[in-house]
Amino acid sequence: MSNYWLNIYKPRGISSAKLVSIVKTILGKVKIGHAGTLDVEAEGVLPLAVGEATKLVQILIDAKKSYIFTVQFGKQTDSGDYAGKVIATKDYIPYKEEAYAVCSKFIGNITQIPPVFSALKVNGVRTYKLARVGTAVELKPRNITIYDLKCLNFDEKNATATYYTECSKGTYIRTLAEDLALSLQSLGFVIELRRTQVGIFKEKNAIRIKSSDAIIKNSLEEKSIKIEAILDDILVLDATDQQAQQIKYGQKCLFNYEKDINLLWVRYKGVVLAIGSLNKSCFNSLRVLNLTQ
C-alpha cells in the first residue's frame, strides 16, 4: 500500500468529502483522510493522508493554519458567509484606518463562539442541520490563538476589507470576520475565504485536480510527500529491534531519554514506527504505523 501525503487545492463549490471521493477514484482502493474540513464556499489547501499517513492526521489538524478572507461590511448573514440569508443590516461602514488598526485587538489568546452553521455536533446531530430547520443552538465559547492578523486591502467603494491571518486549530474565520466587524461598530460576513497553509503544506505547491480520470494517478503520486515530512520539528528517537517489537505489541518500552515529552515519534530502520509521548523514559504510543516488517 502507498503511504504518503498529497497537498491538494480544494476549489470553491465542492465539499471536502467530495474532493476526497474524487481522489479515491483516481488512486483506487486506498484509505484517504483529510486534515481539516473546508466549507463548500471556501477554497484552498486541503492536505490528504493516504494509507498509513491517516494515522498522523491529528498532527496536522492541530497545526497552525493561514487564511486570506474578505469581509463585506454593513450586513450579517445567518451562516456568516455569502451563502446565507441576510438577517441584519447596519449603515455604518468603518474607515480604512479603522479596518487596519483593529487587527491588533485580536492577536493573541482570545475566545470565540463557533457558528451554528458548522460541523460541530449537539446531542449527536450536526449543528448546521439543526440551524437549517430553525432549531435554537447554543454553543459555548472556545479558546483559540490568533498568531497574526493584518489587513491587506480596503475597498471603500464596495465596503469590503481583505485580511490575512495565521491561527490555531479550532478557529472559525466566519466568526472572526463577524467579530472584527462588530469591533468596528458595524456588521460583516465573509464573501471570500482561501486557506493558504496548513502546517508544512502551502498554497503555492498545492495540486489542482481538473479531472477524475485515472490517467493522472501517476501525476499525483509523483507529487506525493513523504509520510515523515510533517514530523520534522518533532523529537525523534531511534528504536532497536527489541524496542520496535515492544511497541508493535503494545508492551512497555523504555528509552534512554530522561525528559518527559508530550509528542515525539519513533523511527525504526529509517521509517516511522509510531508517535506517542514519553513519561519517565517510558514510551506511550498514540498511533503505531505498519510500515516495517
Curated annotation (Swiss-Prot):
Which SUPFAM superfamilies does the entry mention? Answer: Pseudouridine synthase (SSF55120)
Extract the signal peptide range: none
GO terms (molecular function) for this protein are: RNA binding; tRNA pseudouridine(55) synthase activity
Q: Does the record bear Disulfide bond in its keywords?
A: no
Q: Which branch of life, at top level?
A: Bacteria
Which keywords has UniProt assigned to this entry?
A: Isomerase, tRNA processing
Kindly state which reaction or reactions the protein catalyses: uridine(55) in tRNA = pseudouridine(55) in tRNA
Q: Which residues form the active site?
A: 39 (nucleophile)
Q: What is its EC number?
A: 5.4.99.25
InterPro entries referenced in this protein's UniProt entry, alphabetically: PsdUridine_synth_cat_dom_sf, PsdUridine_synth_N, tRNA_psdUridine_synth_TruB, TruB_C
Q: Which GO terms describe its biological process?
A: mRNA pseudouridine synthesis; tRNA pseudouridine synthesis
List the HAMAP family.
Answer: TruB_bact
Similarity section: Belongs to the pseudouridine synthase TruB family. Type 1 subfamily.
Annotated function: Responsible for synthesis of pseudouridine from uracil-55 in the psi GC loop of transfer RNAs.
Protein known as = tRNA pseudouridine synthase B
Source organism: Rickettsia canadensis (strain McKiel)
